[in-house]
A protein has these predicted regions:
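Basic, alpha-helical interaction scaffolds
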Residues: 143-213
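Short, conserved micro-motifs composed of acidic
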Residues: 36-38, 91, 101, 116-151
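Active-site palm subdomain of RNA-directed nucleic acid polymerases
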Residues: 56-86, 90
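Short, conserved non-catalytic motifs in the polymerase core
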Residues: 30-58, 86-92, 162, 184-187, ...
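Catalytic palm subdomain of template-directed nucleic-acid polymerases
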Residues: 1-9, 84-111, 129, 216
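Conserved pre-catalytic core of RNA-dependent polymerases
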Residues: 1-49
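Mobile genetic element proteins and their domesticated derivatives, centered on retroelements
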Residues: 6, 19, 32, 51, ...
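Short, charged alpha-helical motifs in flexible N/C-terminal segments and linkers
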Residues: 107-118, 123-125, 221-244
Length: 244
């Protein structure tokens, strides 16, 4: 299937032959070494080779047509081997059925191309700012309901079903506070040069990561974040009483 997609993508000639030879099971063999003893070689008959420079490109090519299987109002996004299917729900009865139909179309696509989804890792989050969200269950490929969660971590940001970032802010404050404790225990110098270097290289990136998305407007969250910075700056020579 992957070789067929390479041809569809116009990857031919010497490069196409080289990749085909790379994927050919006759040339792909692996062994396991345990305590200096090597097992016999066994052929690798399926899958995209992992741990190679070209593997991410081949994987993206493998799943490139997955998004075409769903309806136009459903979005499919992938990062590495994680895939998200998203749909805005306006008409609960019809839109939920459409989303389940789109999920089934993706399951069928996976069967056609020889891919497998790990149903144990399936998660469903309903982003619903109101008090009650639709209770329509969604099914995994084996017919079991997909596990529902109140939040998920997407590229390092906690997304909660109530459309707030309170959980993410709490996690950021906890992580940065622990890092500050480690810095204060590790570095005895409290000069501006040392401490501000530690702040900019180790701590600030944790506080600022994706802040354009989750930057709070409520005073309680702002106070939590400022308290972290204040706790650090009060240990810097000449900045003990810095006014925020």
């Amino acid at each position: 299937m992957l070789l067929h997609k390479l041809k569809e993508a116009k990857v031919t000639g010497k490069i196409g032959k080289w990749i085909a030879a790379f994927l050919n099971s006759d040339h792909r063999r692996q062994a396991v070494a345990v305590e200096g003893v090597m097992s016999s070689l066994s052929p690798v008959i399926s899958g995209v080779p992992q741990g190679t420079v070209i593997a991410p490109v081949l994987f993206l090519l493998m799943i490139s047509d997955m998004a075409r299987e769903v309806s136009s109002c459903t979005r499919v996004s992938s990062f590495v081997d994680d895939t998200q299917v998203k749909k805005g729900i306006k008409d609960v009865a019809n839109d939920c059925l459409t989303l389940q139909s789109d999920l089934q179309a993706i399951y069928d696509w996976a069967d056609d191309v020889g891919c497998q989804f790990n149903s144990k890792k399936f998660e469903c989050v309903r982003y619903w700012p109101g008090t009650e969200s639709p209770e329509q269950p969604y099914l995994s490929p084996d017919g079991t309901p997909i596990q529902e969660k109140s939040h998920l971590r997407d590229l390092g940001v906690e997304l909660s079903d109530d459309c707030s970032f309170n959980l993410h802010i709490e996690n950021v404050v906890t992580i940065v506070s622990k890092l500050i404790g480690w810095v204060l225990r590790t570095f005895r110098s409290r000069t501006k040069l040392v401490m501000l270097t530690c702040w900019s290289s180790l701590l600030q990136s944790r506080l600022d990561y994706c802040s354009q998305l989750w930057s709070p407007s409520d005073q309680a969250s702002i106070t939590k974040l400022e308290a972290v910075a204040r706790h650090f700056t009060c240990h810097i020579e000449g900045m003990e009483g810095k006014n925020y």
